[in-house]
């Protein structure tokens, strides 16, 4: 349930509004689309943004770094409280649009604005938002950078320094270095398993491992069942390609698998 508010003077920028899925799993009868935000806050499924009532300032934007539910899942429940646009990458924006369309409790009329990696958006005379391209286990992920008169605030929440990705380009290391030289006021950083020493191998290595396993069943006549995160389009792409290599027809099952894959295909990511 990621959500971070940054205040500069009397202007506030909110980064992410996430949904904590494991808390919902505890409450099996929870129908998120029909639940009130206060009830979701009570079970710690979404951020408790009531703390912002004590913070003086105007929210200028709600910025999302990527389309995972733990970063956008609370938007249908909380965004309507703020007279501010929702800014995200094109793929994340479309996922947010779908989230909002399924909401049954609140009406969300915030303007949705798609900002691509490498672009900037002026929020006010003192605040400029920049999206820097990075990699993650979901396509079209960026590191938002908020440029202020006091220096840059880098919101690096979920990223992977993958130099050989399966989809898209490597992270924009040149721009990251340049921002560092220009001066960073604050780095807000988080990444899954960051407490473990070492590094995460490239997705290209994962692709080779998946191919090795799937192609080993080339002469088998039985059905092959493969599970993966539905939002991991690079992995889904690899699985589908490997299926074709051994003369099999890939069949996607599940609403989430359909949502993420169809959206990626329609937007020409695959």
Where are these regions (language model features)?
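His/Asp/Glu-rich metal-coordinating catalytic cores
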Residues: 1-61, 68-270
């Amino acid at each position: 349930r990621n959500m971070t508010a940054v205040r500069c003077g009397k202007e506030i920028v909110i980064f992410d509004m996430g949904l904590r899925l494991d808390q919902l799993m505890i409450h099996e009868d929870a129908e998120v689309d029909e639940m009130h935000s206060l009830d979701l806050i009570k079970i710690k499924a979404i951020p408790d943004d009531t703390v912002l009532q004590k913070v003086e300032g105007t929210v200028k934007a709600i910025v999302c770094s990527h389309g995972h539910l733990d970063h956008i899942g609370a938007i249908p429940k909380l965004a309507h409280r703020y007279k501010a646009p929702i800014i995200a990458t094109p793929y994340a924006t479309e996922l947010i649009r779908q989230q909002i369309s399924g909401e049954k409790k609140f009406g969300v009329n915030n303007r949705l604005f798609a900002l691509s990696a490498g672009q900037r958006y002026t929020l006010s005379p003192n605040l400029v938002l920049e999206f820097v391209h990075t990699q993650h286990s979901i396509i079209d992920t960026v590191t938002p950078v908020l440029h202020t008169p006091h220096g840059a605030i880098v919101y690096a929440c979920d990223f992977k320094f993958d130099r050989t990705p399966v989809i898209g380009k490597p992270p924009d290391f040149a721009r990251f270095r340049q921002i560092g030289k220009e001066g960073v006021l604050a780095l807000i950083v988080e990444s899954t398993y960051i407490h473990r020493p070492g590094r995460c191998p490239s997705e290209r290595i994962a692709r080779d491992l998946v191919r090795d396993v799937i192609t080993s069943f080339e002469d088998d006549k039985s059905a092959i069942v493969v599970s993966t995160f539905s939002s991991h389009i690079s992995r889904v792409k690899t699985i589908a390609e490997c299926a074709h290599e051994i003369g099999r027809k890939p069949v996607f099952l599940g609403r989430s698998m359909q949502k993420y894959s169809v959206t990626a295909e329609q937007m020409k990511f695959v």
